[in-house]
Amino acid sequence: MSNIVSYLFETKAIKFCEENKPFFLTSGMISPYFVNTHFLYGNEKEATEFLSYINTLLEDRVNLPKKVFDKVLVQYKNNAIFKYTIDTMIKAITDNVDVNEIDYISGGERRDWYFSNMIAYLLKKPHLTLFKDMEAFVSPYDFFSTEKITDIEGKTVLNASDLVTAASNYVRSWIPAVKNLNGKLLWTCYVVDRKQGGTEVLEKEGIKTIPLALVDNTLFEKAFELGIINQGQLEMLKGFYHDPYTAMREFLINHPEFIENALKSTDERTQKRVKLLVDGNLYNLT
């Protein structure tokens, strides 16, 4: 088991649901596990506080990159888990790409910035801070200054990211953003591949993918061996890995009380998400 996987377990960056209690996702779909890769910043508390800090900076785009960099640099020097994660990303990049061919490192709003700023610094490459509205800002590797940029004149880009699921952020924002800059997004290094089609989407776009850890049956079996999950949880996870939609649809058919209880929940987020599931008939239950 790689240290990245052990740290994913240790920091609870991968969180498994209790038996027969899958998590609601933002979309209204359900899943037996949830991934918060940014917890590799050190732990859940520090990662969550840093995300809140980033949120306070979103309206100040010119100063945001330097302020984010200052935080991650201190964390890199002081937190062994975060340092190991960044160093492992650097090794994966240098093992798979001729670094001399990379002109820019990019990172997209918001969780990519936990990783991309340090990658740029250590590789001594200028950094592109990308926003979901496709606006871009460029900084030198030491983030001494930042300015808006609209054209990188055919230069090459490697995006450093936390997680790939279906690659929706890439398709919707990061790939178009780099194209709008007249750049070429040729590589992406990310910590976790959820193995739900995103890597294939990126490869079809001509992007070389460099994941550190895969969420697959091998990882689930390791969690079982370590006593993190039980046999029932393992079977649900394996079913989900094989066919997420069918596995969760069958679960809902066999456990009608799950939706009934969610509809009675006093938690606003649960209420919102279960209504998306029911109103959208996301699992074709009616």
What is the meaning of each model-derived region?
Residues 1-161, 165-286:
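PRPP-associated nucleotide enzymes
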